[in-house]
Structure formats: structure tokens, C-alpha cells
């Protein structure tokens, strides 16, 4: 994206493919051709489009798309929004939003709920949803800049021809997940893009102050806005872009040590076995409970073992998980063999061997997805098969490091750096090699 634009208005998919929605309009909203509406509402779909009903259950609009334009100061509440979709923290909650509400019929049975809002107002919610508005000031500034950068780069990527998100092969299933595959809105409101939970999570003025202080600032490289990725905790070393996404190295998304001292990469199985059971002196290796309470939203604090973790399954449990996630019957599961790791120890290619067949899968998110009812915290793990007298595995034990894909900014590491006194510019330089901070509007 060129380094000179105006602040855009964006569309955020709050929920998609919903049979119906209920909520409340707090203040007046204008529906073109209909008039003002406020108070409780519900909506569903039929062959003619969206059916919008008011508090008295009167039909007030029936069209393929219904746009409710907010009067100044008005907000709207959506009930039972699912967050953390397919992750271990998945749940439903009511959320309140600023800006306009758009209801679009997907088909005769489902609708999409979309929020139209200015980018800067969107960011205040993202910062407060991804982390906590009580986090250190320099960290909130860092997150404002990278979230702004990611969003602008994502808008630009929508207009590009992308490589297929799957590498074909009969014995290999190598798949990754792009974040610009939404067709009727710019970004979604969940972890697939950036967490956006409206004004519900804005618990202090600090996030708004950080967004305002950094207004229009982005990370740039080579004259373009950076695709600034981020995640919760690297485990000690961040990852190269191509371990998680397409085989196109990005100069500012390269592996770095999450410390002032260089650490050797975790490329071999011997090094991985040592790494996942170690406790290196790195920024995201923190036991500062006060800081974690300041920076993590409530549901993220439920995850206590994010730096190093352990998961165990019986063989039959893991066989069923893999069968459910992949749709493939491997028979009796014999082995899981890492074939290729990135510098952080995250597995890029993993062979699954069963009595019926053997398949190589990747990349990191697909591996995490296949080996858990939700997702493993990361693909930086070792796996040991505990075998019975007949030589067949009875249990599989996973020892792992970190939380997330590992590419770009380590959120917990960056927050620790801010607590130690590092400035936003220093934190960004640490995680994004060679990138610069630029003001574009």
C-alpha cells in the first residue's frame, strides 16, 4: 500500500452465516426508505433477503441488505456473539458496538452481521480486545501501530492475486490460512483476523490515548505498509513467515531471539527436545502475575502454561481427534514424526503414520488443528509415543513451547519489554527487522 492515504472506513464481520440475530439499538439508527429505529430488534432471512423486526415484532425492513446508520452517540448490542472460534477459549458473549450496523442475507436461511466503522475507532477496540487496555503505555502504542499496519496491508492484499493456500500432493497435505478471504466485509472480528469485540472490552482510556497518540503511524518497509503479524508468546524465538504461510520470505518477518542475546535455532530433534523442557532467559518467559493481569483479557488468563506446556492423549483419543479433524482413517496410529522445523522449533511438516496409510501434513496451523479437539498452543513441540508390550503406542505425550504461530511480534514479550522501560520504537525494531515507523495520514 502506498505511504500516503486518508483514514479509511472499514467493514468488520461480527458474525457470519447466522440463522438469526437479536440485539438492541441504543439510540436512533436510520434505515433508508424506512425511517428511524431504536430499541430491541431481531433479524432473520428468507428468499427475499433480510427480515428486520422491531420491539413489537413488526416487520420494518425486508431487503437483501439492510443498513442502519447510527446517529451520533448511538451504539448497538448484538447478543450471543461467538468469540475464539475453534480455539480453546471459544465462548459466547453479548457485545456493544459503535458505528453503523449492516445486515446482509447470505442465502434464504442465513445472514451476516457487519459493523461499518472508521479505522481509528476500530483500533481502540482491537487493542482492548487483543490484550487489555490497562497494559503498559508503550506496549499499547506498539499494538496500535502494528494493528493499524496489519489492517491496511490486509486491505491492500485483497486486491492482489495470491498463491493458493494449499500445496498439492498425493502424500502431502500442506495447507495454510490466509486472512483476506472474506468476500462481503474487509475483516472478521475474531482471531482469524484481529480480535474486535466492540466497546465491550474498553475498560480504560489508555487504549484510546495510545491509538490517538499514534494516529496514522504504521510500520513500513521498502515504501509499503508492513504486513505486521503478531501472536501471544513465541516461547523464546520467533518464527519465519514461510513456516506458517506461503513460501515467500518477508524480510521484516524473520526469526529473532526474544532476548538481547542470540539463541541458537531449534532445527534438530535433539535441540527441540532440550528446548521444550528448558527455561531460557527471554522476555516472554515471565512469572510476573501482576503484569499478566494488566496485559491479558480475562479469558486469556485462563491459559496459565503458555511458555512451556504439556498435553497427553491415549492412542484411541488421538486417533479419533485426527479422524474427526482430517476426515482420514489412518487405522492404528503408529507414529508422529517431525520432518521440518523452523528456527523457533515450530514444525512445518509432520508425518502421521498409521496402519492404513502415512501422510505428511503442514503447515503449522494445520498441524495444531489436526492434533487437538481445538488447537494445540503451537507447533513447537516434541511428541513421545509410550509403547506397550506389543510395541504399539498406548499414549502420546506432547511437550511444547509458546502460544501462537510465532511470526512477527510476541505480545507478551513486547509487554515485558515495555515494563522494562523500552520505548515503542525500540520494541518494534526488535521484532520487525529493518522496518521503519512512518506517518501516512
Report the location of each language-model feature:
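Conserved, single-site charged/polar hotspot
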Residues: 1-441
Amino acid at each position: 500500500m502506498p505511504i500516503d492515504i486518508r483514514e479509511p472506513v472499514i467493514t468488520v464481520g461480527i458474525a457470519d452465516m447466522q440463522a438469526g440475530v437479536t440485539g438492541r439499538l441504543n439510540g436512533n439508527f436510520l434505515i433508508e426508505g424506512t425511517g428511524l429505529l431504536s430499541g430491541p430488534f431481531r433479524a432473520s432471512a428468507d428468499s427475499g433477503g433480510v427480515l428486520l423486526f422491531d420491539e413489537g415484532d413488526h416487520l420494518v425492513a425486508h431487503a437483501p441488505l439492510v443498513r442502519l446508520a447510527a446517529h451520533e452517540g448511538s451504539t448497538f448490542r448484538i447478543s450471543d456473539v461467538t468469540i475464539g472460534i475453534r480455539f480453546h477459549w471459544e465462548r459466547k458473549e453479548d457485545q456493544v458496538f459503535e458505528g453503523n450496523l449492516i445486515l446482509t442475507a447470505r442465502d434464504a436461511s442465513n445472514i451476516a452481521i457487519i459493523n461499518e466503522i472508521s479505522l481509528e475507532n476500530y483500533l481502540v477496540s482491537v487493542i482492548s480486545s487483543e490484550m487489555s487496555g490497562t497494559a503498559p503505555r508503550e506496549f499499547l502504542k506498539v499494538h496500535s501501530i502494528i494493528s493499524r499496519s496489519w489492517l491496511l496491508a490486509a486491505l491492500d492484499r485483497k486486491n492482489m492475486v495470491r498463491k493458493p493456500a494449499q500445496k498439492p500432493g498425493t502424500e502431502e497435505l500442506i495447507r495454510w490460512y490466509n486472512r483476506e478471504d472474506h468476500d462481503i466485509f474487509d475483516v472478521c472480528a475474531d482471531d482469524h483476523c484481529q480480535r474486535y469485540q466492540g466497546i465491550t472490552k474498553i475498560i480504560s482510556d489508555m487504549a484510546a490515548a495510545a491509538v490517538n497518540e499514534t494516529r496514522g503511524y504504521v510500520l513500513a518497509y521498502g515504501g509499503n505498509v508492513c504486513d505486521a503479524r503478531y501472536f501471544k508468546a513465541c516461547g523464546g524465538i520467533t518464527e519465519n513467515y514461510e513456516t506458517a504461510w506461503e513460501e515467500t520470505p518477508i524480510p521484516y518477518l524473520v526469526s529473532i531471539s526474544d532476548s538481547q542475546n542470540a539463541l541458537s535455532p531449534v532445527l534438530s530433534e535433539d535441540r527441540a527436545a532440550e528446548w521444550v523442557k528448558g527455561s531460557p532467559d527471554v522476555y516472554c518467559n515471565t512469572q510476573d502475575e501482576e503484569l499478566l493481569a494488566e496485559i491479558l483479557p480475562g479469558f486469556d488468563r485462563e491459559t496459565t502454561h503458555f511458555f512451556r506446556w504439556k498435553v497427553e492423549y491415549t492412542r484411541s483419543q488421538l486417533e479419533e481427534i485426527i479422524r474427526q479433524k482430517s476426515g482420514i482413517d489412518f487405522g492404528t496410529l503408529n507414529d508422529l514424526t517431525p520432518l521440518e522445523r523452523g528456527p523457533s522449533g515450530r514444525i512445518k511438516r509432520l508425518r502421521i503414520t498409521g496402519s492404513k496409510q502415512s501422510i505428511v501434513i503442514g503447515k503449522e496451523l494445520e498441524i495444531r488443528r489436526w492434533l487437538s479437539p481445538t488447537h494445540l498452543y503451537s507447533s513447537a513441540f516434541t511428541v513421545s509415543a509410550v509403547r506397550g508390550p506389543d510395541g504399539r503406542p498406548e499414549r502420546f505425550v506432547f511437550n511444547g513451547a509458546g502460544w501462537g504461530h510465532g511470526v512477527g511480534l510476541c505480545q507478551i514479550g513486547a509487554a515485558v519489554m515495555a515494563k522494562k522501560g523500552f520505548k515503542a520504537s525500540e520494541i518494534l525494531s526488535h521484532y520487525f527487522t529493518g522496518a521503519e515507523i512512518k506517518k501516512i495520514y
